Amino acid sequence: MKKEYFGTDGIRGTVGEPPITPDFMLHLGWAAGRVLARAGQSSVLVGKDTRISGYMLESALESGFAAAGVNVKLLGPMPTPAIAYLTRTLRAAAGVVISASHNPHEDNGIKFFSDDGEKLDDATELAIEAELRQPLKPAPSARLGKASRINDAPGRYIEFCKRSFPYELSLRGLRLVVDCANGATYHVAPAVFHELGAEVIPLADDPDGLNINADCGSLHPKGLQAAVREHDADAGIAFDGDGDRVIMVDHRGEVVDGDGLLYIIARQRMANGGLAGPVVGTVMSNLGLEQGIGRLGLPFLRAKVGDRYVMEMLRREGGILGGESSGHLICLDRTTTGDGIVSALQVLEAMAAQERTLAELADGMDRLPQIMVNVPISRGVPVQDHATVTDAVRDAETRLAGRGRVLLRPSGTEPVLRVMVEGPDQAEVSATAEAIAGAVREAHATLTAPR
């Protein structure tokens, strides 16, 4: 059965427009409470990023859960992976994150974690949607839920992150610029790196409810690149608004994306005595990553885009390490979901253990030029099947002749079609991507023209 509200990463949209409205969130809290809360364990954790709309949505969800007879423990602004960790360690029935990740403040969303700190499976999301179709009926007065706050949540998570870094190593002597995207990591990430010995120069760590991801964070690294050069830093670290993504910048100011970081972590794991199972990327992962992992003697598998699909493939194939180019990195022996801080610490572990710069570590992977063009489209318009587009893709694949890849993929979070092309020649890749993007625009105009 097709889901009506849940996408690849929960429920997301523009604040004030369905489903990101207070009345829907009230109903969602009630529906989720009825599905997720177990007998004898009826508490959920609710955390959020720093968007101003988080207050409104938090209050609505809190009321909905209470109406279902579920107790609510409010965490305040916390990274998404922190909520997954705390859900598991505090033995809650579920964790709820109010965030739209890397999107601007005008957007917001909801994602859930099960009691073991993992994202919900399709069956559970469908069960919540089934409850949403029922009228909201509060529990009897004596069984209504209560709400309370957990004030020591940041400290608990900081200590968890520090424990993921080898005790015998230190970050002393490293100067790090840390871009918190004016998001949920602002009050925890600098503390983690500082307490492990690094000199920390914080960036975008002053959220006002409106500046989350605004020209900062993992999607906008130019400010971080400039700051690394200005401060003569050893590396820069950038998170997205909810802290489940990370990209890094080397001492020269060059970006190392999720593919490069995944390679560095895999190589360090092999140096530490091996890595169980395959490394899992996605269909968008650079071909250079696949080749680099192969040189380490490890199999490389590709999942659909979305960290939940990377997670599913890791579980199915017996792997522990995977990730996306965007910086969602998963290390199942340390976390149950993508964790930007923990992932960055593993890269810093490699730097400290090998006494090499980030640039030297990243140079071990030969990246192929890759271009991605996001073409705005209307949802539900089948542009990929239009002859103009299929012909353009066929022509591109013929020209690349097995030396590269072409991939068209609708975004799961935005109304765009992502056109990805990679190959050995930058100019050829750019021209090919623009040609296909032009074909997509032409097909979309044809399919949406008034009849």
UniProtKB/Swiss-Prot annotation:
Stated name of the protein: Phosphoglucosamine mutase
NCBIfam families given in the database record: glmM (TIGR01455), PRK10887.1 (NF008139)
Organism superkingdom: Bacteria
Species of the source: Alkalilimnicola ehrlichii (strain ATCC BAA-1101 / DSM 17681 / MLHE-1)
Assigned protein family: Belongs to the phosphohexose mutase family.
GO cellular component: cytosol
Cofactor: binding details: Binds 1 Mg(2+) ion per subunit.
InterPro entries, sorted: A-D-PHexomutase_a/b/a-I (IPR005844), A-D-PHexomutase_a/b/a-I/II/III (IPR016055), A-D-PHexomutase_a/b/a-II (IPR005845), A-D-PHexomutase_a/b/a-III (IPR005846), A-D-PHexomutase_C (IPR005843), A-D-PHexomutase_C_sf (IPR036900), A-D-PHexomutase_CS (IPR016066), Alpha-D-phosphohexomutase_SF (IPR005841)
Residue positions binding Mg(2+): S101, D240, D242, D244
PTM note: Activated by phosphorylation.
Pfam families reported for this sequence: PGM_PMM_I, PGM_PMM_II, PGM_PMM_III, PGM_PMM_IV
Reaction catalyzed: alpha-D-glucosamine 1-phosphate = D-glucosamine 6-phosphate
Enzyme Commission number(s) from the entry: 5.4.2.10
Function: Catalyzes the conversion of glucosamine-6-phosphate to glucosamine-1-phosphate.
The protein's enzyme class: isomerase
